[in-house]
Amino acid sequence: MNVVFAVKQYISKMIEDSGPGMKVLLMDKETTGIVSMVYTQSEILQKEVYLFERIDSQNREIMKHLKAICFLRPTKENVDYIIQELRRPKYTIYFIYFSNVISKSDVKSLAEADEQEVVAEVQEFYGDYIAVNPHLFSLNILGCCQGRNWDPAQLSRTTQGLTALLLSLKKCPMIRYQLSSEAAKRLAECVKQVITKEYELFEFRRTEVPPLLLILDRCDDAITPLLNQWTYQAMVHELLGINNNRIDLSRVPGISKDLREVVLSAENDEFYANNMYLNFAEIGSNIKNLMEDFQKKKPKEQQKLESIADMKAFVENYPQFKKMSGTVSKHVTVVGELSRLVSERNLLEVSEVEQELACQNDHSSALQNIKRLLQNPKVTEFDAARLVMLYALHYERHSSNSLPGLMMDLRNKGVSEKYRKLVSAVVEYGGKRVRGSDLFSPKDAVAITKQFLKGLKGVENVYTQHQPFLHETLDHLIKGRLKENLYPYLGPSTLRDRPQDIIVFVIGGATYEEALTVYNLNRTTPGVRIVLGGTTVHNTKSFLEEVLASGLHSRSKESSQVTSRSASRR
């Protein structure tokens, strides 16, 4: 169950099926992002694709010597663009691939427009999602709900993305959903409808234990997306923002032109692949090792290129050297900027108090620490508001709740009204009234003992004590202990055996901390394979945008074969 591999396979197959010869790849805005996540431009160039164009671009030239591979979402807009294209074709022959199920009437419209008979084939290839990591996918949707209910357009897009994911992994799952969320139940029903309607597509070889799709709601854990992060990928997203593997460094003081935007992709960057889940402290020493390794391999200026053999060796090593030099400067810049922000915003202290708020139950200590940090001029309004949000969620119903006093402290610190209003919005979004589970107190004797022992021996790393609520949910699911009264099955049947292939989807967005949890569970649980997806992948900033978009605040204070379907063929 590798989503990067699944999407990569589809794109390889499209290019292979078009045969030898020069090609153009025609995409829309969304499929451009889908392709760029799994292939670099230079990799695709090696497959004789010499031109990349957008279907909505008005000024494309006529190039009759090129074959066109079209990879598009099956939207009305895209179908109209293709119809216009076929009436006045710019290329010699067209291979059309839709990223999801396309209606028969749309296929008929394409056939009628193809008077010059330039279409070689029309197929469905289900790469209709963003493959972020091998076990993490996103739909890049920010603001999926209005209040507690779906925005209809986003429900439709999410259903398409999730069913495409299932088809690309060849899974016809049983479905469980979070009972406390109306949105989770609605999505479960929509996915089930598609599976029933398109039953021929979902006829995969039966496995002994059927796969399981578990649909959750971000409202059940509003703590995780509010925390500062200390593992490389999660930290980069939290402090700099990752958008389709791209990081904008244009605001970094003294940044050179070629580093204003960098790409971090585990597919093409060995250092990133090896370090993305490591703690920030380890990254620092690994960067040092990378630098030292680079220094050893660096061609010495004095190195005499006397013989042809010397020159040949230099030229052969140079591309590798150049690539390594790019990797070194990129990671040194990124890590340098993370360090600068940690120091400038006093994030070590801030994060320690965040972890205390997320993991411990000492109210007076937490309150004292927040008040102390709110007095610190280095603590930004963003971080100050975030601390008060965590307090408001954790101690919402505590007998000594001091939220009004903290709100006054925020005002006195000069925190803008926007952030002050967000405190109540976050509680409205993910407070006790909404949650289907208890986020803070351990539920059974074993958990209470564990927490007590953890308190006694101290924690190895105070900055990474927190485990997302998803960890407990998946742990219970894997052990067959996830309560059916909280996470019912859709329909009459239930799973007797422990699940092996699990797809978890979070409405309202997943996080990189949760992706790390899934990565670790995959590594340490033999026989279990988990893929995590979300409407988006959040950092704190985007999560607060999600909360605002919901409008709630206004009311408060590996198989090698590819699943595809031929729509019509000539």
Swiss-Prot record:
Protein's membrane topology:
Peripheral membrane protein
Q: Which GO terms describe its biological process?
A: intracellular protein transport; vesicle-mediated transport
Localization of this protein: Golgi apparatus membrane; Endosome membrane
Q: Which domain of life is it from?
A: Eukaryota
Which residues does this entry mark as bearing Phosphoserine? 307, 441
A GO cellular-component term linked to this record: Golgi apparatus
Similarity section: Belongs to the STXBP/unc-18/SEC1 family.
Sum up the protein's function in the record's words. Answer: May play a role in vesicle-mediated protein trafficking from the Golgi stack through the trans-Golgi network.
Disorder: Neutropenia, severe congenital 5, autosomal recessive: An autosomal recessive primary immunodeficiency disorder characterized primarily by neutropenia and neutrophil dysfunction, a lack of response to G-CSF, life-threatening infections, bone marrow fibrosis, and renal extramedullary hematopoiesis.
PANTHER family in the cross-refs: VESICLE PROTEIN SORTING-ASSOCIATED (PTHR11679)
Does the entry feature the keyword Ribosomal protein, yes or no? no
Please provide the record's keywords in A-Z order: Disease variant, Endosome, Golgi apparatus, Membrane, Phosphoprotein, Protein transport, Transport
Q: Which InterPro entries match?
A: Sec-1-like_dom1, Sec-1-like_dom3a, Sec1-like, Sec1-like_dom2, Sec1-like_sf
Q: Which residues form a coiled coil?
A: none
Q: State the SUPFAM superfamilies in the record.
A: Sec1/munc18-like (SM) proteins
Per the record, the gene is: VPS45
How this chain assembles, per its entry, is: Interacts with STX6. Interacts with ZFYVE20.
The protein's name in its UniProt record:
Vacuolar protein sorting-associated protein 45
- UniProt note on tissues of expression: Ubiquitous. Expression was highest in testis, heart and brain, intermediate in kidney, spleen, prostate, ovary, small intestine and thymus and low in lung, skeletal muscle, placenta, colon, pancreas, peripheral blood leukocytes and liver.
* Pfam families listed in its UniProt record: Sec1 (PF00995)
**Organism phylogeny:** Eukaryota, Metazoa, Chordata, Craniata, Vertebrata
